[in-house]
């Protein structure tokens, strides 16, 4: 303190050498925008049939800027092999992402006497490109900096179908069954922000996977004298 006033290491000159003084890049902030949209439809046709459906779409966009001191330029610029690849400089980098998620959920229900049926499905699609740019490099003009230093994208499709039944066989005895099929497709490509070596450059991404799942479930329940309930089920989950 000095005259009752406190100072931080960032603005105090009380014996700190220049190399210990710290400053921060003012624009290093996390920024993210998300917009959610939904359309919901619910309709009962009669005492037996009902329908529910929901369509949705979500948009997202985010970025942050970061100051890097004495960064290796080979991790950001396409430099020729040799001594020039070891050049370093101060720079400001920006990482950006944009995502889209859309889909539909729908189901129908049917009830008659002692039987309840439900069936439906859903589908969704998700994509989310990521990329990075350089806003500024010390000692270089803007046109010398080039384009994106990493760039990748991902696509995901997710769909499922289901059917469900509940049947009151007798007083206190109910049987139920539930069947679900799910399909997932996932692709990713491009390069991420991890530098591997001078020969490889940024780490490559190459994923192409498809998955199929079938999840059956069945069982019964029995209520005795309105006080005791016995329950048995069998299921397979994937």
Predicted regions and their residues:
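Flexible loop and strand-edge segments within Gram-negative outer membrane beta-barrel domains
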Residues: 1-35, 62-67, 93-98
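Face-selective signature of the C-terminal outer-membrane beta-barrel domain
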Residues: 31-196, 221-225, 229-233
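Outer-membrane beta-barrel domain signature, especially the mid-to-C-terminal portions
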Residues: 190, 200-209
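Short, contiguous strand/loop micro-motifs
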Residues: 24-26, 92, 148-149, 204-205
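Acidic glycine-/aspartate-rich tracts in secreted/extracellular proteins
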Residues: 237-238
